[in-house]
From Swiss-Prot:
Sorted UniProt keywords: Cell membrane, Cell projection, Disulfide bond, Glycoprotein, GPI-anchor, Leucine-rich repeat, Lipoprotein, Membrane, Receptor, Repeat, Signal
Protein name: Reticulon-4 receptor-like 2
One annotated GO biological process: corpus callosum development
SUPFAM superfamilies: L domain-like (SSF52058)
Protein's membrane topology: Lipid-anchor; GPI-anchor
LRR repeats: from-to residues: 61-82, 83-104, 107-129, 132-153, 156-177, 180-201, 204-225, 228-249
Signal peptide interval: 1-46
Quaternary context: Interaction with MAG is controversial, and may be indirect. Does not interact with MAG, OMG and RTN4. Interacts with MAG.
Family classification: Belongs to the Nogo receptor family.
Residues covered by region (Important for interaction with MAG): 315-327
Residues covered by region (Disordered): 308-399
Organism (species): Homo sapiens
UniProt feature, compositional bias: Basic and acidic residues: 351-360
Disulfide bonds: C31-C37, C35-C46, C265-C288, C267-C310
């Protein structure tokens, strides 16, 4: 080493300055202003900063990006790095997502776009390329329709949150590519009809929530193929009748909620009543709204004599296909004109299980067991800071890097006491 350089390095301040100069070309990308970053796993947390756009110069190694509770309006291609695994954008002002925005995020596993009240439509290829996506959140937006191929190619998707939108209709085969989907949340929309092939392809579905819609008809084959479904919520709709064949296609069903519908307990109720005589499920009450002499009674508690004047019902067996030339009203179980509307229901969760003919024994699973790992979107939407991003345990994360304090400067600060 040259004598002059040796003397320079013997001065602590000079040595630190040289260290800073040498470190600059090798320094990791800086953390965006007002954000907090972690090194392991690479995480950028920028929530609740009133950002109107995604921060520039995000570290390309970022795997988790939290941008919720900002004012972001538009998403464009090239904004996000290809290493992302988790992307939270809920509770922003999103109104436009340009085609190709997520196309190169082939590693992405979770995408939360929920609670964006200005997001009224999506392009057909919005989610193209997200073959590893497992969880997609689109709750509480203003979506009134969905393109027929919007979910095409999402072969790894397990959780789909579409509740509290303004959806009026679901196209047949909308979910055809979602063979691994286990949870589908559609409650709080404006759906009026469930068609024959609306849920085709969902062979792994475990929970289907359809309460709080405006359903008037369910096709007798609407649930065909849902052989693993255990939870079905249809309460707080406008259903006066329901084809017994529809429920007969659900051999694994354990929890059924049908309350707060204007059930007609006349001859139209016989198929549903007959299904209840054979089924072993935990069910809510099914209160009769008509005819007047049966108003207030539970449909499940009716007797064979109550249907004595009805024409003989064709026997149905679980999983059997509908035969014959039936009218559309019979296929869908549509209520007659003038049926009273459903009473408003506040029972959106944790409904009591009422089933005198249901499972026996203390070891049977309860509904709470099935919901133990589910965090409602209402609670999540209020979350200002993900705990995993804001509190980094020392054994799982590297040091937090705050924007505005380059790490080489720490060296200079540590040397200050040597000169006092």
């Amino acid at each position: 080493m040259l004598p002059g350089l040796r003397r320079l390095l013997q001065a602590p301040a000079s040595a630190c300055l040289l260290l800073m100069l040498l470190a600059l070309p090798l320094a990791a990308p800086s953390c965006p202003m007002l954000c907090t970053c972690y090194s392991s796993p690479p995480t950028v947390s920028c929530q609740a900063n009133n950002f109107s756009s995604v921060p520039l110069s995000l570290p390309p190694s970022t795997q988790r990006l939290f941008l919720q509770n900002n004012l972001i309006r538009t998403l464009r291609p090239g904004t996000f790095g290809s290493n992302l695994l988790t992307l939270w954008l809920f509770s922003n002002n999103l109104s436009t997502i340009y085609p190709g925005t997520f196309r190169h995020l082939q590693a992405l596993e979770e995408l939360d776009l929920g609670d964006n009240r200005h997001l009224r439509s999506l392009e057909p290829d919005t989610f193209q390329g997200l073959e590893r996506l497992q969880s997609l959140h689109l709750y509480r937006c203003q979506l009134s329709s969905l393109p027929g191929n919007i979910f095409r190619g999402l072969v790894s998707l397990q959780y789909l949150y579409l509740q509290e939108n303004s959806l009026l209709h679901l196209q047949d085969d909308l979910f055809a590519d979602l063979a691994n989907l286990s949870h589908l949340f559609l409650h709080g929309n404006r759906l009026r009809l469930l068609t024959e092939h609306v849920f085709r392809g969902l062979g792994s579905l475990d929970r289907l929530l359809l309460h709080g819609n405006r359903l008037q008809g369910v096709h007798r084959a609407a649930f065909r193929g849902l052989s693993r479904l255990t939870i079905l919520y249809l309460f707080n709709n406008s259903l006066a009748s329901l084809p017994g064949e529809a429920l007969a296609d659900l051999p694994s069903l354990e929890f059924l909620r049908l309350n707060a519908n204007p059930w007609a307990c006349d001859c139209r109720a016989r198929p549903l009543w007959a299904w209840f005589q054979r089924a072993r499920v935990s069910s809510s009450d099914v209160t009769c709204a008509t005819p007047p002499e049966r108003q207030g009674r539970d449909l499940r508690a009716l007797r064979e004599a109550d249907f004595q004047a009805c024409p003989p019902a064709a026997p149905t067996r679980p999983g059997s296909r509908a035969r014959g030339n039936s009218s559309s009203n019979h296929l869908y179980g549509v209520a007659e004109a003038g049926a009273p509307p459903a009473d408003p229901s506040t029972l959106y969760r944790d409904l009591p299980a009422e089933d005198s003919r249901g499972r026996q024994g203390g070891d049977a699973p309860t509904e709470d067991d099935y919901w133990g790992g589910y965090g409602g979107e209402d609670q999540r939407g209020e979350q200002m800071c993900p705990g995993a991003a804001c509190q980094a345990p020392p054994d799982s994360r590297g040091p937090a890097l705050s924007a505005g304090l380059p790490s080489p400067l720490l060296c200079l600060l540590l040397l200050v006491p040597h000169h006092l």
